[in-house]
Regions:
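C-terminal structural segments of small proteins and small subunits
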Residues: 62-97
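A short, flexible low-complexity segment enriched in Lys/Arg and Gly/Pro that occurs
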Residues: 1-3, 29-35, 96
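A generic structural signal for short beta-strands and their flanking turns/coil linkers
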Residues: 5-9, 35-37, 63-67
């Protein structure tokens, strides 16, 4: 019997322009490196696929918005690496400032 490994991580949008097309594409590019991992992103009652640029943009995440990333599948090591890459991206404000 296989168990689905799930991690959850919150990130705060810190860049002035929020989650527009370029940051959304950066997130999707990172997530797509991990083929066996599924990612959902939640903001209040909205939940979208983390591999969808349009879905991420539909969250209307402005500066100061907190997003919950739900990461499923793959190995624990891959999930931790993915979280680390996303953390760096959010902390560096998507390299916009």
């Amino acid at each position: 019997m296989a168990f689905l490994i799930q991690s959850r991580q919150k990130f705060c949008v810190k860049n002035r322009l929020g989650l527009h097309a370029t940051p959304a594409a950066m997130i999707v590019k990172i997530i797509n490196k991990y083929k066996e991992i599924g990612v959902w992103v939640r903001h209040f009652d909205e939940q979208v696929n983390g591999k969808s640029i349009m879905g991420l943009m539909m969250l209307e995440a402005y500066c100061g918005t907190e997003l919950l990333f739900i990461i499923e599948g793959g190995s624990i090591a891959d999930q931790r690496t993915l979280i680390g890459e996303l953390k760096e991206l959010f902390e560096k404000k998507f390299f916009e400032e």
